Amino acid sequence: MAPPHAVDTKQPAAVTEAVKAAFAGIGAEASFPLLERLFADVTGMFAGRYPGYQAIDMQYHDYEHTLQATVCLTHLLQGRSRSLDRPVLRTRDWELAIMSVLLHDSGFLKKTGDLTGTGAKYTFVH
């Protein structure tokens, strides 16, 4: 995988390809359809194409922030997988980690009819 700063986190397709390259590095090409669907769903979520919900309206917790976190986590997974530490991370561990980072701000989604405030109101502390 390219160094984190070399991945254009303003472009979901660039991050998707970087993550897929990392998965290929551990022989997990079978995860590609899952990753493609996940990135497509999360892109739609942030853009307001998730049925019954608005686009995420947070200034910092935007899609680029999520993509930046995804690139960073992917590098952590790669480093951990090259180490001799145990337990060994399996493909499913990688999948769950990427799902988690991509969805970590989904709690900020507001329902379509909710017109007051931002999604931050759904957190206990923000």
Region locations from a protein language model:
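Generic serine detector
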Residues: 12, 31, 81-83, 100, ...
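Non-catalytic interface/linker regions that flank or bridge core catalytic/transmembrane domains
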Residues: 1-56
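Divalent metal-dependent catalytic cores for phosphoryl transfer on phosphate-bearing substrates
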Residues: 92-126
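Alpha-helical phosphate/pyrophosphate-handling elements in metalloenzyme active cores
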Residues: 54-96
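Short helix-loop boundary/capping segments at the starts of domains
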Residues: 44-52, 72-82, 108, 112
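Hydrophobic transmembrane alpha-helix bundles
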Residues: 1-6, 71-76, 94, 119-126
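Generic structural concept
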Residues: 39, 70, 98-100
